Amino acid sequence: MRNKSRGFPNMNNNKFEGEPRAKDDFASKRPDGSTNTHPQERMRASGKR
């Protein structure tokens, strides 16, 4: 049986519902399917949000 169904408290305030953390602005692929360039800049920008 999973902890959620047993009623255990959420000790670390982990968020399992809602929006995913990854945003399209920082994705490695563009909407047209091509690869996004400059991965270091993209990852740095993702960490500064």
From Swiss-Prot:
The keyword Ligase does not apply. Residues 16-32, 39-49 have a biased composition (Basic and acidic residues). InterPro entries: SASP_SspK (IPR012611). Its main location: other. Induction: Expressed only in the forespore compartment of sporulating cells. Keywords: Sporulation. The keyword Transit peptide does not apply. GO terms for biological process: asexual sporulation; sporulation resulting in formation of a cellular spore. Residues 1-49 are annotated as: Disordered. It is found in: Spore core. GO terms for cellular component: endospore-forming forespore. Belongs to the SspK family. This is Small, acid-soluble spore protein K. It comes from Bacillus licheniformis (strain ATCC 14580 / DSM 13 / JCM 2505 / CCUG 7422 / NBRC 12200 / NCIMB 9375 / NCTC 10341 / NRRL NRS-1264 / Gibson 46). The lineage of its organism: Bacteria, Bacillati, Bacillota, Bacilli, Bacillales.
